[in-house]
């Protein structure tokens, strides 16, 4: 039986990796082995950072809410506790947006939270 070489399969796989490596510097975009290493690392970073982005935005929102709440005389935890007791169902993304763009509206929320504590 004749030996078969993996010509088409290998060529297709290499082309796929080199296409993903387009725009990389030097051998990383021209040669398969460094391109493959770089692409695998890039895909790993992309997956990791998609998950980290969610955590980072939540941290940013909490920091903004905390700063605005402290300007109105409450800590973050007291403010969130007061909102929960008052039955206000706003997530942290919306609260942070209100804190940045509508100081008067945020002050009203703080007063509502203070009243329910």
UniProtKB/Swiss-Prot annotation:
<dbReference type="InterPro" id="IPR035566">
    <property type="entry name" value="Ribosomal_protein_bL20_C"/>
</dbReference>
<dbReference type="InterPro" id="IPR049946">
    <property type="entry name" value="RIBOSOMAL_L20_CS"/>
</dbReference>
<dbReference type="GO" id="GO:0000027">
    <property type="term" value="P:ribosomal large subunit assembly"/>
</dbReference>
<keyword id="KW-0694">RNA-binding</keyword>
<dbReference type="GO" id="GO:0005840">
    <property type="term" value="C:ribosome"/>
</dbReference>
<dbReference type="GO" id="GO:0003735">
    <property type="term" value="F:structural constituent of ribosome"/>
</dbReference>
<keyword id="KW-0699">rRNA-binding</keyword>
<comment type="function">
    <text>Binds directly to 23S ribosomal RNA and is necessary for the in vitro assembly process of the 50S ribosomal subunit. It is not involved in the protein synthesizing functions of that subunit.</text>
</comment>
<keyword id="KW-0689">Ribosomal protein</keyword>
<dbReference type="InterPro" id="IPR005813">
    <property type="entry name" value="Ribosomal_bL20"/>
</dbReference>
<protein>
    <recommendedName>
        <fullName>Large ribosomal subunit protein bL20</fullName>
    </recommendedName>
</protein>
<keyword id="KW-0687">Ribonucleoprotein</keyword>
<dbReference type="Pfam" id="PF00453">
    <property type="entry name" value="Ribosomal_L20"/>
</dbReference>
<dbReference type="GO" id="GO:0019843">
    <property type="term" value="F:rRNA binding"/>
</dbReference>
<dbReference type="GO" id="GO:1990904">
    <property type="term" value="C:ribonucleoprotein complex"/>
</dbReference>
<comment type="similarity">
    <text>Belongs to the bacterial ribosomal protein bL20 family.</text>
</comment>
<dbReference type="GO" id="GO:0006412">
    <property type="term" value="P:translation"/>
</dbReference>
């Amino acid at each position: 039986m004749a030996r078969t070489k993996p010509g088409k399969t290998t060529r297709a796989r290499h082309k796929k990796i080199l296409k993903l490596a387009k725009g990389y510097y030097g051998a990383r975009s021209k040669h398969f082995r460094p391109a493959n290493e770089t692409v695998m690392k890039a895909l790993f970073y992309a997956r990791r950072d998609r998950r980290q982005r969610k955590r980072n935005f939540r941290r940013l929102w909490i920091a903004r809410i905390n700063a605005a709440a402290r300007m109105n005389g409450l800590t973050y935890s007291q403010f969130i506790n007061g909102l929960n007791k008052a039955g206000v169902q706003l997530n942290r993304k919306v609260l942070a947006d209100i804190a940045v763009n509508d100081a008067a509206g945020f002050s009203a929320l703080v007063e509502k939270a203070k009243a329910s504590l």
